[in-house]
């Protein structure tokens, strides 16, 4: 993508003629109506839409099926159709080649997605002309068995029933900083501070801050409070020999089981994700409302039943 200035702030990329729109879809929800709207817009604007060939059975005509590597190489921007989980997958997909990712909400409660399906055409017009802002997101990166793992929400060491608790030593800047014994340890990015870490009692951290939050879940002994650590400080977690064998989770997906004595080194990668924002103030207000719902003893959709019902106004007959 070419780069345009956004009032002297974060440079805003704009699509070049030879770049395609990449599509990332929810693994279960039917995306057909929204994809058809997207391909219709693309035809009328001379744009090409590509998607992972593994989703071929769920893609209508007008979308080129390509390999994951080709999708990453050719996409000038990604359109994520789903909720926050789909959005996280899209961000991870292009973490080594960040391009703007626009989230279209096909889910329920979300903090990353912004665009509603009925707003898609107008949103694509703005994406095409560079009339948007970029919200930069950091990622937590660890190297595991020569494989680099990227998390935009969190990395967690979660105990497995019957396997014993997680027992680990935290090292910051090469110095031991404390010991944990708990059911799970969560290393969260700023955006991930609204997820698993928040449920464990961790603080909310502004996306503008380069920091990680380490939150113990159900601590038994050792450090029992969350800690906020600068993203510039390399940190490591080393499992003690009498620790259980926890599951290593990256953005909620189990990657493998860890063994006592193993250690993980985690670093924060700033500006690893570029999220498209069309109305940052409106999105912030929505996020504040959504965040307040998390502390209520109801599911978001159940809140509608608590609102007073109003009679619909009578239709005024045409004259």
Predicted features by range, described:
Residues 2-77, 81, 89, 118-133, ...:
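ATP/NTP phosphate-donor binding region
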Residues 48, 98-100:
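Proline-centered loop/turn at the N-terminus of a beta-strand
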Residues 26, 79, 83, 105, ...:
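A residue-level signal for conserved active-site and pocket-lining positions in enzyme catalytic cores
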Residues 149, 157, 162, 173-176, ...:
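ATP/nucleoside-binding phosphotransfer catalytic cores, i.e., glycine-rich phosphate-binding loops
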Residues 165, 175, 179-223:
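Gly/Ser/Thr-rich active-site loops/lids in small-molecule metabolic enzymes
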Residues 89-96, 197-201:
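Short Gly/Thr/Asp-enriched flexible loops that form oxyanion-binding sites at enzyme active sites
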Residues 84-86, 109, 191-193:
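Short glycine-rich anion-binding loops that position phosphate/pyrophosphate groups of nucleotides
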């Amino acid at each position: 993508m070419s780069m345009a200035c956004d009032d002297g702030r974060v440079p805003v990329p704009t699509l070049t003629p030879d770049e395609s729109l990449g599509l990332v879809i929810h693994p279960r929800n039917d995306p057909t109506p929204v994809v058809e709207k997207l391909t219709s817009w693309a035809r009328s604007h001379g744009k090409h839409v590509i998607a992972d060939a593994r989703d071929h059975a769920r893609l209508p005509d007008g979308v080129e099926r390509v390999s994951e590597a080709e999708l990453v190489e050719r996409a000038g921007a990604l359109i994520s159709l789903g909720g926050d989980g789909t959005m996280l997958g899209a961000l991870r997909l292009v973490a080594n080649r960040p391009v703007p990712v626009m989230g279209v909400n096909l889910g329920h409660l979300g903090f990353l997605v912004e665009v509603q399906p009925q707003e898609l055409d107008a949103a694509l017009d703005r994406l095409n002309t560079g009339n948007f802002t970029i919200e930069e997101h950091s990622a937590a990166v660890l190297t595991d068995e020569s494989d680099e793992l990227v998390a935009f929400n969190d990395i967690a060491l979660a105990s497995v029933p019957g396997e014993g608790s997680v027992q680990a030593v935290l090292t910051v800047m090469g110095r031991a900083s404390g010991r944990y014994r708990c059911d799970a340890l969560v290393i969260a990015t700023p955006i991930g501070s609204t997820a698993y870490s928040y449920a464990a009692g961790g603080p909310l951290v502004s996306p503008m801050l380069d920091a990680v939050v380490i939150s113990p879940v159900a601590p038994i002994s050792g450090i029992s409070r969350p800690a906020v650590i600068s993203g510039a400080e390399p940190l490591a977690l080393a499992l003690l020999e009498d620790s259980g064998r926890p599951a290593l989770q990256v953005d909620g997906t189990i990657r493998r089981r860890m063994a006592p004595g193993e250690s993980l080194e985690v670093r924060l990668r700033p500006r690893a994700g570029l999220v498209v924002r069309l109305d940052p103030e409106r999105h912030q207000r929505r996020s504040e409302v959504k965040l307040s719902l998390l502390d209520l003893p109801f599911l978001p959709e159940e809140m509608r039943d608590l609102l007073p019902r109003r009679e619909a106004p009578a239709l005024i007959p045409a004259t």
